[in-house]
Amino acid sequence: MTGVQTCALPIYWIDILKLRVGYGQTSNQAVDPYKTWGRLATRPYNFGPTGYVTGYYVSELPNAELGWEYSSTWNFGLDFTLLRGRLSGTFEYYIQKTTDLLQSVSLPSTSGVSSYMANVGKTENKGFEFTLNGTILDNHNGWTWEASLNLSANRNKLTELASGSKDDKANNWFVGHPIDCIYDYEKVGLWNSDDPDFQYLDILEPGGNEGMIKVKYTGDRDASGKPTRAIGPEDRQIISLEPKFQGGFSTRVAYKGFDLNVITAFRCGGKLISTLHHSNGYLNMLTGRRGQVDVDYWTPENKGAKYPKPGGIQSGDNPKYGSTLGYFDSSYWKVRNITLGYNFEKQAWLTRMGIQSLRAYLSVQNPFIICSPFHKETGLDPETNSYGNENVAVTEGIQKRFLTVGTNSPSTRNYLFGINLTF
């Protein structure tokens, strides 16, 4: 009689390894009171010395069919601790499906109301979240060094519109694309005489001229490469605003009583909208009617400029395709906080005062931006959001949930000094 014996060797470098699977359903009732009824607002008007009256107008349309938003989520996670606690972290992958999505729907100006709240469709979110914490030095000759990294990525997709259509261009909604996207022309430069397509300028841009904004042409060409039509609304592109990934990195270094903490944040890819450069902004209105900052606009001697030449083809008060000037790469890596502190050793004078511990620290918030294409060009903080993450539609096709930098107060650099006492 023979037998087989197995022996499981312990893996000493693994302390904890845990798998998690979860499923849940939640609802979102983030609807203000009386949204289903609609609202009236007052508007005073003066018809003369004795003709002051107050009128009423519809400020919000009623929606009797407004309902809750529902989300179902699958989570798959891994928790680990390695090397006797020196390294730990989590990894989580999720799939979330949302039905009856609550969004503010933009309406034509002729309706008299800018928007109303509705259940507009279904979305799907897939992504991951990863955190890693490590102790690089653990009181080695008095030195301690710790670091932490968090990383996340999300892919959003609109899977269905309640109307049954494939798109809603007025609200920038397109089935199969992220719900946060813009529908506009894609700027590829400025028209210059050395451009291979300049010979077709009269076809692509009837009445156009050198120095105006050039946008991407998506139409057909004949055998010789000649465009078959002018650039028009059919050339607008669906441009996603989602970043490829985002996260943060922090580190702490301590030596004896001193400690230094640095917290950073980063974002890779995606788009932000600058209302300073967008349509009706302050930097693209070069008609001499407003005082301007120093603008890099096109001239025959400056053909590599960013902005079109003044006095070119206008669209209202803006240069044609002026909205394309407001789209920027939203990538950045910035330092959010630096704190330097000192923990005093327990001494007789502290004991006499009844103080058990004493710590002094100096902290600076938003000290500097390490790298950012938007900051390099404008000097502005790419993380500042003029509107916040509100689900409210606004003019010019910019939704308040979009990352938008505008004329609101910029982020400030703050210096703090503090003392922590424990009695």
Residue ranges and their predicted role:
Residues 267-359, 363-365, 386:
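Extracytoplasmic gating/loop element in the C-terminal half of outer-membrane beta-barrel translocons
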Residues 118, 124, 137-241, 281, ...:
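Conserved small-residue
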Residues 10-69, 88-123, 162, 166-168, ...:
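Solvent-exposed loop/turn elements at secondary-structure boundaries
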Residues 120-127, 171-196, 297-303, 320, ...:
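C-terminal beta-signal and terminal closure region of outer-membrane beta-barrel proteins
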Residues 46-88, 116-140, 176-184, 240-245, ...:
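Outer-membrane beta-barrel signature, preferentially recognizing the C-terminal barrel domain
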Residues 23-29, 93-99, 134-136, 151-157, ...:
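Transmembrane beta-strands of outer-membrane beta-barrel pores
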Residues 15-21, 76, 87-89, 145-147, ...:
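Transmembrane beta-strands of outer-membrane beta-barrel proteins
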Residues 2-9:
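Short, small-residue-biased leader/transition segments that mark boundaries at the very start
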